């Protein structure tokens, strides 16, 4: 009797465990999910956020997956710019959020009060400045100045964070032992807030790029304005995707916001590559056959990793870039490339078969848009469509590289794709007429046929430029073809 009772109890417990495994995840309100009755499910948390966009409050409600929750980006508010809440019960994000209202204006001051308020601090600052100058003329100040360590290096913070390790060591340790999604949030903030900006090295759609120094190491700092918070947030989110790190994808270091009470800067810190973008590199340099193959192979390797889904508990979703061009690819010291600027990227959830398209009004670069994007025939409900559009753009980048390859002393001057067919800043209509209606593609010079490497590269380009996206090569196929070419040409990629 006792044995039968124990057996029945064991079966009941197994049934309860099975039911728990099959139970649906957390249900949340999702304002972006009109196809699923504005509802989504997740194993992470429900998310509600209100942000200031063009002077108006914009509300977003959605699900946060466990990897995204662990990245600690979603549940973070910034002063007067966003208010964000994460919660963990069904439909708990069905709430109304508002940005904090400014405190009521203080009563107006009269002329006498204003004069006192202005005069007193100015006098005090003047006295303090005079005392400082007088003190620094003395021997004691001179001695300290000589013996003082470099003020640009906040050594205590450096020692606290890295303990003798380089940034690459820190990132490798976290990638090898943790989630693979980047440094902990506290370390990111410590790094970002102890960086000394050196010089501006570029400007883009979303802000400026600076060369910075942290503990004697070079870093790149992409600075967004507060009105582009959505772009900063999206790019930081993509860069912190689990298992994204790859030698041919720009190495992400930190994301942080700098708020001094009057304005907010949003920082994205990454590895610094002094050679600059591929566009700048090709304008300055001629490449050898081996150099061309190294550049092309590294781009294909980075894109293949981006496009590939890694299945597992520490897996990576497939990602499409959506803005591949020579200005968004950086050249490293070793003459290989790293794909950058992931702010427009999309992620594919193969389990739910959904595409995480960013709510961003900015699109890719018109000159590099695939035919199906120009004539609006692209099926945005199929993730493969985005990968195929990337391949078309890569073909154009390869054309830019191959033109600068010197064979027998013959080399073409650097030009952008379609330079002889459209103006310097073409419209979508102008690109559609050339690419879709007239079906033109960049010309491939006849002299490329005399060089095996250029002949293979020309064939790859043509197979990337097919009007039918399904007929184009995959990034992995391109990588394998160029790898074989690398072996034939005996180049060390």
Curated annotation (Swiss-Prot):
Residues 1-20 form the signal peptide. One of its GO terms (molecular function) is ATP binding. It is an enzyme of class 2 (transferase). Residues 165-194 form the GS domain. Pfam families: Activin_recp, PK_Tyr_Ser-Thr, TGF_beta_GS. It catalyses: L-threonyl-[receptor-protein] + ATP = O-phospho-L-threonyl-[receptor-protein] + ADP + H(+); L-seryl-[receptor-protein] + ATP = O-phospho-L-seryl-[receptor-protein] + ADP + H(+). The chain crosses the membrane at residues 114-134. Its cofactor is Mg(2+); Mn(2+). Its main location: membrane. Changing residue 194 to D: Pro-apoptotic. Residues 22-113 are extracellular. GO terms for cellular component: activin receptor complex; plasma membrane. The active site is at 323 (proton acceptor). Keywords: Apoptosis, ATP-binding, Kinase, Magnesium, Manganese, Membrane, Metal-binding, Nucleotide-binding, Receptor, Serine/threonine-protein kinase, Signal, Transferase, Transmembrane, Transmembrane helix. It is a single-pass type I membrane protein. One of its GO terms (biological process) is response to glucose. ATP binds at residues 201-209, 222. Gene3D superfamilies: CD59, Phosphorylase Kinase, domain 1, Transferase(Phosphotransferase) domain 1. Present in pancreas, heart, colon, small intestine, ovary and the hippocampus, medulla oblongata and putamen of the brain. Isoform 1, isoform 2, isoform 3 and isoform 4 are all expressed in the placenta throughout pregnancy. InterPro entries: Activin_recp, GS_dom, Kinase-like_dom_sf, Prot_kinase_dom, Protein_kinase_ATP_BS, Ser-Thr/Tyr_kinase_cat_dom, Ser/Thr_kinase_AS, Snake_toxin-like_sf. Its EC number is 2.7.11.30. The keyword Chaperone does not apply. Serine/threonine protein kinase which forms a receptor complex on ligand binding. The receptor complex consists of 2 type II and 2 type I transmembrane serine/threonine kinases. Type II receptors phosphorylate and activate type I receptors which autophosphorylate, then bind and activate SMAD transcriptional regulators, SMAD2 and SMAD3. Receptor for activin AB, activin B, activin E and NODAL. Belongs to the protein kinase superfamily. TKL Ser/Thr protein kinase family. TGFB receptor subfamily. Binds the type 2 receptor protein ACVR2A. This is Activin receptor type-1C. It comes from Homo sapiens (Human).
């Amino acid at each position: 009797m006792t044995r039968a009772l124990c057996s029945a109890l064991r079966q009941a417990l197994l049934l309860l465990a099975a039911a728990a495994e099959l139970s649906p995840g957390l249900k949340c309100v999702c304002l972006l999910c009109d196809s699923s009755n504005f509802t989504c499910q997740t194993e992470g948390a429900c998310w509600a956020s209100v942000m200031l966009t063009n002077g108006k409050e914009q509300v977003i409600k959605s699900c946060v997956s466990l990897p995204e929750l662990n990245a600690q980006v979603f549940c973070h508010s910034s002063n007067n710019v966003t208010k964000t809440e994460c919660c963990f019960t069904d439909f708990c994000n069905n709430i109304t959020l508002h940005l904090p209202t400014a405190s009521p204006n203080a009563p107006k001051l009269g002329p006498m009060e204003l004069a006192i308020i202005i005069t007193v601090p100015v006098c005090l600052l003047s006295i303090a400045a005079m005392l400082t100058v007088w003190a620094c003329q003395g021997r004691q100040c001179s001695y300290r100045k000589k013996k003082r360590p470099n003020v640009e290096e906040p050594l205590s913070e450096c020692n606290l964070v890295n303990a003798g390790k380089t940034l690459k060591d820190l990132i490798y340790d976290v990638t090898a032992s943790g989630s693979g999604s980047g440094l902990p949030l506290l370390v990111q903030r410590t790094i970002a807030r102890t960086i000394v900006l050196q010089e501006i090295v570029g400007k883009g759609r979303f802000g400026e790029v600076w060369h910075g120094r942290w503990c004697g190491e070079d870093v790149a700092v992409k600075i967004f304005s507060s009105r582009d918070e959505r772009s900063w947030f999206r790019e930081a989110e993509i860069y912190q995707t689990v298992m994204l790190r790859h030698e041919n994808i720009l190495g992400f270091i930190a994301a942080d916001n700098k708020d001094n009470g009057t304005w907010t800067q949003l920082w994205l810190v990454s590895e610094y590559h002094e050679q600059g973008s591929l566009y700048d590199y090709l304008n300055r340099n001629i490449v050898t056959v081996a150099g061309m193959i190294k550049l092309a192979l590294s781009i294909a390797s980075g894109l293949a990793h981006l496009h590939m889904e890694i299945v597992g508990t520490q897996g990576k979703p497939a990602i499409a870039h959506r803005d591949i061009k020579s200005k968004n690819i950086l050249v490293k010291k070793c003459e290989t490339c790293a794909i950058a600027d992931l702010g427009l990227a999309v992620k594919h959830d193969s389990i739910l078969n959904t595409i995480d398209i960013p709510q961003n009004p900015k699109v890719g670069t018109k000159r590099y848009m695939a035919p199906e994007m120009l004539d609006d025939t692209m099926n945005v409900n199929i993730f493969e469509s985005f990968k195929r559009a990337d391949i078309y753009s890569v073909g154009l980048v390869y054309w830019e590289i191959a033109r600068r390859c010197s064979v027998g002393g013959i080399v073409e001057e650097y030009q952008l794709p379609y330079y002889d067919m459209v103006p310097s800043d073409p419209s979508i209509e102008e690109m559609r007429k050339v690419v879709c209606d007239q079906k033109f593609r960049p010309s491939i010079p006849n002299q490329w046929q005399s060089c095996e490497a250029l002949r293979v590269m020309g064939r790859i380009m043509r197979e990337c430029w097919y009007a039918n996206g399904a007929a184009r090569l995959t990034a992995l196929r391109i990588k394998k073809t160029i790898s074989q070419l690398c072996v034939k040409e005996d180049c060390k990629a």
